Amino acid sequence: MSELLLPPEHRYAKIIKERHNEDGSELSVLNLGPTHPATHGIFQNILLMDGERILEAEPTIGYIHRAFEKIAENRPFYQITPLTDRMNYCSSPINNMGWWMTLEKLLGIEVPKRAQYLRVIVMELARITDHIICNSILGVDTGAYTGFLYVFQFREKIYEIYEEICGARLTTNMGRIGGFERDWSPEAFRKLDKFLEEFPPAWKEFENLFERNRIFLDRTVNVGGITAEKAMAYGFTGPNLRAAGVDYDVRVAHPYSSYEDFDFIVPVGKSGDTYDRFCVRNAEVWESLSIIRQALEKMPAGNEYHAEVPDYYLPPKEDVYNSMESLIYHFKIVMGEVPVPVSEIYHAVEGGNGELGFYLATDGSRTPYRLHFRRPCFIYYQAFPEMIKGALLSDAIIILSSLNVIAGELDA
């Protein structure tokens, strides 16, 4: 049997024996996960340790694999949206909008400018939520619990905005082909204005708690670094790539949903270490706030919140209950009886943790012929073993946290 097919414990046994014979080192094998609280999800890493230092690492994935891509091949297009919610659930509206935009690209549907701006606001709120979670949890892993408690109240305020828009909080299933299911209420805009007023001072204090904190700096500077060349070789995108010094953002390189209408800076780091990843996400929160304000200022007048495409757009529920025509359209669309061309496309959006891509191939039937999700977490986790070699066990936890690997997206 090839050594590569042996379990890590067996392969490591040979290394342990050789090292013990050479210099008397007492090496050990440690299972980190799959149900360890420090890993923030169902991850397993089998580590070869020399004391507290990691010599080798091998990840095991698939503990919560749900075969999303195969399930999608047997579902009508509208019924796939809930699957996207359950990948990176920290920023699920971005996943929803990415999927709708993929279908709109396939069908050649032009979304009204106002609906595009509303989507931008939702996606930037989701990005803020994602970065709040990632950076505050990184603080917890370095021993600073205060920041986590301080900013998590604002995640709740964003969830209240989601609730006002679509009725859901975490797995939002937000939007429709062509726009939104309903126009935003005045209460949604009021809550958004209140968030934009209250959150910036709190985020500034959060930054001050960490960016000049000597203990935090000691735990994160020059820890888990990766070069720009290595990051690109692995296929890094998002904050993890930009922290390594590469200026690439899907919103700028391939604008969608009218992102070209907004002025914002793409924050870029230098060393690609844990501290740079933290700082890039902090800076991106400020840019997201700026984009939201610009979208509100430039919002077109009127109440256009969806494209006029009755063959694809689900009618409002009140119409379904009171109109036979709306009921028929609702049934046809949900059950997949909609005209779809034979085609294949790829569409990507800038997710909370990197480029989230959708490759969709259709054969004209009511379900996709093939659907592939480009999941940034899957790529980061491949680099994780190399990034923690030679690091201390306590540093490995921090490095994983700074990469923002979400188990639901990793395994899909």
Curated annotation (Swiss-Prot):
Q: Which Pfam families match?
A: Complex1_49kDa
Q: Which GO terms describe its cellular component?
A: plasma membrane
* Main subcellular location: membrane
**Which keywords belong to this entry?**
Cell inner membrane, Cell membrane, Membrane, NAD, Quinone, Translocase, Transport
Where in or outside the cell it occurs: the entry states: Cell inner membrane
Q: Which reactions is this enzyme annotated as catalysing?
A: a quinone + NADH + 5 H(+)(in) = a quinol + NAD(+) + 4 H(+)(out)
Per its database record, what is this protein's job?
NDH-1 shuttles electrons from NADH, via FMN and iron-sulfur (Fe-S) centers, to quinones in the respiratory chain. The immediate electron acceptor for the enzyme in this species is believed to be a menaquinone. Couples the redox reaction to proton translocation (for every two electrons transferred, four hydrogen ions are translocated across the cytoplasmic membrane), and thus conserves the redox energy in a proton gradient.
Protein's recorded name: NADH-quinone oxidoreductase subunit D
The gene is nuoD
